[in-house]
Design a protein with these regions (language model features):
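Inter-motif core of Ras-like GTPase G domains
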Residues: 112, 126-152, 167-173, 177
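Helical mechanochemical/support elements of P-loop NTPase systems and associated helical scaffolds
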Residues: 84, 88-99, 122-129, 139, ...
Length: 265
């Protein structure tokens, strides 16, 4: 306590925390986007922070499963999957200094650090783990909130997605970009809906009034003004991580966000 960190962030990597609900395609994005960045000439490393991952499509440069694995903790402490994941994240927090030390060493030698977070969004974004890592790592950081395009079946889904994105942003204290994945399988024009939400909110309200019904629709309608007050208009980025489509746009908005890091307005 009381000692200043000797870690020099001036030449360290930019950190991208890839977050999202289970099945959003986080690990696929980590793999494919890392290769995209390497093709541009960058030095890129990937950290896996999911203790429950059985297989990964990439070879992690840091793997939290070296500290704890879900299957082991379930067997040892007679826990189910949900309790096991919570207990596993507690163990990671208990050994957080080890995690931070390794990530900082990786960051010293590379341009980008992609962090593939827990399969369950809430374990990283809304519990102690995410906040501790972001705060202690002390590196330029941006969050990517990855959303499966199939989750958008009606206009109010856009509102709820942006509400979650805003909550993550202020919980972790970093800029968060909402990225829509699996756009090749979308059933509705997600980009159109999201652009209307940001740039024509009154038209979007009318769309909700005309198509959505029930309490959730009423709540979404009332939330639009509050969300847009704190979440400024932004370009809508849609990708297919598997096919690497939209990666130029993703790279561009990440670059822009890092250039304005710290501006939460």
């Amino acid at each position: 306590m009381g000692e200043e960190s000797s870690f020099n962030t001036a030449s360290a990597a930019q950190v991208v925390y890839i977050m999202g609900f289970a099945g959003a395609g986080k690990s696929t994005l980590a793999k494919e986007f890392s290769e995209f960045l390497r093709d541009l000439g960058y030095r890129v490393v990937i950290a896996n922070l999911d203790p429950g991952a059985e297989t990964l499509p990439y070879k992690p440069d840091y793997d939290v499963r070296s500290i704890v694995r879900l299957a082991d903790i379930m067997r040892r402490e007679s826990l189910g999957p949900n309790g096991g994941l919570i207990r596993a994240t507690e163990i990671i927090v208990e050994r957080i200094s080890e995690v931070i030390d390794y990530l900082q060493r990786l960051a010293r030698l590379n341009d980008w650090l992609l962090v593939d977070t827990t399969g369950q969004l809430e374990l990283f974004a809304f519990r102690e783990l995410g906040e501790r890592i972001v705060t202690m790592l002390e590196l330029p950081s941006v969050g990517v909130y990855l959303v499966d395009a199939s989750m958008f079946s009606k206009p109010s889904d856009v509102v709820m997605t942006q509400l979650i994105s805003l909550a993550i942003q202020y919980r972790l204290g970093i800029n968060v970009i909402t990225i829509v994945n699996k756009i090749d399988s979308e059933r509705i024009p997600v980009r159109v809906l999201m652009e209307e939400f940001f740039f024509k909110p009154e038209d979007f309200k009318q769309r909700i009034s005309g198509s959505d019904l029930g309490v959730l629709a009423d709540l979404a309608y009332d939330l639009i003004d509050s969300i847009t007050r704190y979440l400024p208009p932004t370009r809508v980025i849609t990708i297919s991580a598997l096919k690497r489509t939209g990666f130029d746009d993703l790279y561009s908005i990440l670059h822009e966000t890092f250039c304005t890091c710290g501006d939460m307005t």
